[in-house]
Regions:
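Alpha-helix termini
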Residues: 17-25, 94-98
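Accessory C-terminal segments flanking Radical SAM cores
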Residues: 110-200
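Acidic, glycine-rich loop-and-strand cores that form catalytic or ligand-binding grooves
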Residues: 94-114
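Generic structural signal for well-ordered alpha-helices
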Residues: 14-21, 55-58, 84, 88
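Core AdoMet radical
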Residues: 1-12, 21-56, 67-72
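Active-site glycine- and acidic-residue-rich loops that bind
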Residues: 7-9, 76-83, 135
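Anion (oxyanion) recognition and catalysis
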Residues: 62
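Short, electropositive alpha-helical surface patch
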Residues: 80-99
């Protein structure tokens, strides 16, 4: 997950991304935070000029054949259909090869409210929902962050929970190869249920 702005645009980071993409062709996908496809709404969340900087980073990724996905937000009052059409036009304008209709490539997150009650995830849920635990992102993905002032990077289980200590899995990808307990409200709301109900 990246905003594709200054940290990603450092020459050393760009060189590292290019090496990774060359070593593992077709296996690297960067999810870019684009709160909204309209400059005024994105910049209202991220600061003046933010979308322009993100687009510059995305163009670099495009030109270096690094696959992209987008994490957007659905808190601006538009329908899912209208949001996806807007992102589609944004992608077309910049020649970004991202499918706006694929919820895995254009993820639209609702507002995250930890106070909203959600059902507990049980083993029965997987059968009721006809889903597999392997389908949730934390079963196969990790996020590496370097916190300000920290001596080493941290490997997190989930992009939605960057500040929850129980989802910090260590300081290396090897340390982070472990099962993740789905015990946060966001696990149920966003990843497992995704709007479905755990009652048969």
């Amino acid at each position: 997950l990246t905003n594709a702005m200054r940290p990603m645009m450092r020459k050393s980071v760009q060189a590292g991304l290019a090496r990774l993409n060359e070593a593992y062709p077709g296996k690297l996908t960067l999810r870019i935070s684009v709160d909204h496809y309209r400059t005024d709404l994105h910049d209202a969340e991220r600061g003046a000029g933010a979308l322009e900087k993100t687009v510059t980073g995305m163009k670099w990724l495009r030109d270096n054949n690094i696959r992209m996905a987008v994490a957007g937000r659905s808190v601006f009052g538009a329908t899912d259909e209208d949001s996806r059409a807007g992102y589609g036009a944004f992608y077309a304008e910049h020649s970004f090869d991202i499918d706006p209709q694929d919820p895995g490539m254009t993820v639209l997150f609702p507002e995250m409210d930890e106070t909203v009650e959600v059902p507990e995830i049980t083993t029965a849920c997987w059968g009721i929902l006809d889903k597999s635990p392997d389908a949730v992102m934390c079963s196969s993905s990790r996020m590496v962050v370097k916190r300000k002032g920290a001596a080493t990077p941290a490997v997190l289980a989930c992009t939605l929970l960057p500040y929850s200590e129980e989802f910090e899995l260590g300081h290396s990808l090897e340390e982070a190869e472990k099962d993740v307990a789905l015990n946060h409200p966001h696990c149920a709301k966003f990843c497992v249920l995704g709007g479905a109900s755990c009652s048969a």
